Amino acid sequence: MAGNFWQSSHSQQWILDKPDLLRERQHDLLALNEDEYQKVFIFFANVIQVLGEQLKLRQQVIATATVYFKRFYARNSLKNIDPLLLAPTCILLASKVEEFGVISNSRLISICQSAIKTKFSYAYAQEFPYRTNHILECEFYLLENLDCCLIVYQPYRPLLQLVQDMGQEDQLLTLSWRIVNDSLRTDVCLLYPPYQIAIACLQIACVILQKDATKQWFAELNVDLDKVQEIVRAIVNLYELWKDWKEKDEIQMLLSKIPKPKPPPQR
């Protein structure tokens, strides 16, 4: 996407302040502590990733779907819509916006049913409960909550340009790209511009690969290095949390603690 980020709705409406983000979460944080809340979002980012891969979507589409998912819950409690319904809805919408092509509703439902049964049976004892009408209704609600701001700028393009400018090899790009994917399991996509996220992921990759010669290159960048370090800390904290998390043992308990949507009134 080659448009001007700074003039986009992403820049002007969807780079949020951390205090505002935390304030919107207060209802959910009565039921879950902050680590548990992040684990729930790691899990559903994994769900979106698996569904996207089984649908053979490009990573750009999967990343956009994950950002939609996080944007929705940046303004809504988990009780407003079941995350298991919102996840495939975000994929459906992202595939349209990223011009991937139309995913048939029946195929999407079939993939969801298969993935829950084969990949996430440790989290859900029951079958995937939703049908096409639920996803289409949810899509309208999602569009409304996103204010129809559907263009998402990702860190992948600036990352490619940075690695090219640095003159480094494919190993660095491959690792940095994976770290960008992992960053979708944090709040950084809601708080920082994509070029800052790209720089932070590149910096982490350089440390892992012990590329000391790149320090001067980073020092000469015209960028807010304090912001970059905030992103680095958020991603490192993710890895610390991930390292000790026994997802298959814990996720059912965490999902049971999520506030549930109120049933509609009986007529």
UniProtKB/Swiss-Prot annotation:
InterPro entries: Cyclin-like_dom, Cyclin-like_sf, Cyclin/Ssn8, Cyclin_C_2, Cyclin_N. It holds the Pfam family Cyclin_N. The keyword ATP-binding does not apply. Keywords: Cyclin, Developmental protein, Nucleus, Repressor, Transcription, Transcription regulation. It comes from the Eukaryota. The keyword Glycosyltransferase does not apply. GO terms for molecular function: cyclin-dependent protein serine/threonine kinase regulator activity; transcription coregulator activity. One of its GO terms (biological process) is sex comb development. It is found in: Nucleus. Its main location: nucleus. GO terms for cellular component: CKM complex; mediator complex; nucleus. Residues 48-151 form the Cyclin N-terminal domain. Component of the Cdk8 module of the Mediator complex, composed of CycC, Cdk8, kto and skd. Component of the Mediator complex, a coactivator involved in regulated gene transcription of nearly all RNA polymerase II-dependent genes. Mediator functions as a bridge to convey information from gene-specific regulatory proteins to the basal RNA polymerase II transcription machinery. Mediator is recruited to promoters by direct interactions with regulatory proteins and serves as a scaffold for the assembly of a functional preinitiation complex with RNA polymerase II and the general transcription factors. Belongs to the cyclin family. Cyclin C subfamily. This is Cyclin-C.
